[in-house]
Amino acid sequence: MINRRHALGLFAAASFLPSRSFANVSYQRSEFRDDLAKRFFDLGTVGTFVGYKVDDYLIIASDKVRSGEGKLPASTFKIPNSIIALETGVVEDPDKDVFKWDGVTRSIEAWNKDHMLRSAIAASAVPVYQEIARRIGQQRMQKYLDLFDYGNRDIGGGIDQFWLTGNLRIDPIQQIDFIDRLRRGVLPVSKRSQELVRDILPATKVGDATIRAKSGLLGAEQGKPSLGWMVGWAEKGSQQTVFAMNMDVRDPSQIPARMTVTQQCLADIVAI
């Protein structure tokens, strides 16, 4: 049987995308779909969507170029940050350990209060996760990003900024590879940490399907959004599809479109 990471890696190679640390074993099927690319054109922006129908080893993408371009992960990094926090004991219980508000009033009201890990990931509370990263520290953070083979694994630019304004980059194929391993519980950390993070991921019901996903938005805290992400997986009956979407956000009115266009693309590939 073909390993899922191998299938993703060969998709990257066959698509003439930048090389990654995936083994060179044949994948089964891949498709590029113009109708997915049109979703971004209709929004008046550019972006990419990649869906991975795991039971079929079928990878469906909107393009061959942007799907292999590394970007700052923004708040999608809250997923690995949460795993590392639990694994290192920085957080023991996502529903009990309290991160006190620092008293600084920020433009996003949901950030201006105390949080636990579950509420912090739901509110995408950047200050909480910056404090988590500081408590994890440079050495442990680097250790786990290396273990996860997460993006370019470069945490330069500050322990509380590297995923927002620093050196970390990840592309949609790499996002899918990481998310799929979390979904299956095969990351090189405890089952408990992975189960808890799967449980706290925001979930959205769409008909008889469920989307478990984390958004990201570069520039959110400055009120100057520039890049939007949505990564996660969709469940419909026994069918599961891992996905990653990113798009240029050219106007604040496009911020909600991160989920809208993701749902449209998932529907287009019959994942929801």
Spans of features found by a protein language model:
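Structured C-terminal helix/loop/strand segments within mature extracytoplasmic catalytic/sensor domains
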Residues: 25-37, 70, 134-137, 183-272
